[in-house]
Amino acid sequence: MPIRRNPATPTPGIPFARPFAWLVAWLVAWLVAALAFSAPAIAQRPEALWYARGEASITSFLAHADKVTAISPQTFTLDRNGTIKGGIDPRIVATARAKGVKLIPLVMNPGFDQPSIHRVLTDAGARARALVSLGRMCTDHKLDGIQFDIENVHVRDKDAFTAFARDAAAVVHKAGCTLSAAVVPRTGEDRGPTAYHQWIWDNWRGAYDYKALAESLDFLSYMTYAQHTGNTPAGPVAGFPWVEACLKYLLSLGVPPAKISLGLAAYSDWWFPAWDEKAGPRMRGHDISWTRGMEILGKAHVTPAWDDAQKATFAAWDEKGVFQYVWLEDARAFTAKLDLVRAYGLRGYSVWKLGDEDPKTWEIIK
């Protein structure tokens, strides 16, 4: 029951009321400032970059362009002589211009051929030609930016690739475009315990000096997918613990969150027994769309389950005595990884690729 006081009786402690109010206000202001300093800045609408390859990608882009910030068609190649070839489907160009979507096509070493990119990085003539070609590509196609999709670079070319990216950024920026790079992720500097781990380190993961690249480039698309592939046993395309471990490592190097676009998978994977004359009998992993994954499960009369640890949907079933496996990157899995973008205050996300996604994915993108 509240204490009733005589209005004429002075309230005890009134001489201290004003200083106490000042102290409370000061503490509140300090706490707000501390939280603002320590917490990551969360973008209201993270930049949504989607990759495109093939007709299904174009169809999806035309239907969902209003939820795409940047479109990156994989349609340009950089050959061993430093020559860039390719173009962009006019439907992509027209829709991007009409909807205000940035055009940031990929430039890749064709087939991710290692000897070709080694020559570009180490031969003076090919290197110079590549730099000129990048500047012309930017102006000739009236692009907003260019993104390197240069993969299967041997670790011995790490410094050469870093220097090439730095010089390319100067050329491309002068031409009025941004330059970014899609980079293969890793969780640390350890080559790993097995020959497989060491092979993937030497040829795929180890060649990226993330911090130096981030200093030269506008941002990095950090490809946290392909955790399991056709070269590995069945497993999630991008298991949540692995994705977050890769991201934490990148941040630990001092790469600013504002320069990180988290790579998200829209595709799924299917492992099944196969045989051909070259390879003989083997277990094969194959990238598939979400729609194809659901068709496979429907044909097998299998209901997938949710793996809460990996934040992914999966199924395994007996097909005449031999197991098959599907790991789906559905809308629920996509949401779990998208939450990392917000939690760590990242620039945005980069999705491989349009046309592979669960249609419900678009419902969760604001």
What are these model-predicted stretches?
Residues 52, 75, 105-109, 150-152, ...:
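A cross-domain feature marking catalytic cores of carbohydrate-active enzymes
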Residues 80-83, 154-297:
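Substrate-binding surface in catalytic domains of secreted glycosidases
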Residues 266-340, 361:
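Glycan-binding loop/region signatures in secreted carbohydrate-active enzymes
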Residues 71, 148, 220, 262, ...:
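Conserved, mostly hydrophobic/aromatic
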Residues 44-133:
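Glycan-recognition patch characteristic of GH18 chitinases/ENGases
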Residues 52-65, 124-139, 202-211, 329-340:
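Short, acidic/polar
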Residues 22-38:
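Bacterial N-terminal signal peptides
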Residues 333-366:
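Acidic/aromatic/glycine-rich contiguous surface patches that form carbohydrate-binding/processing clefts
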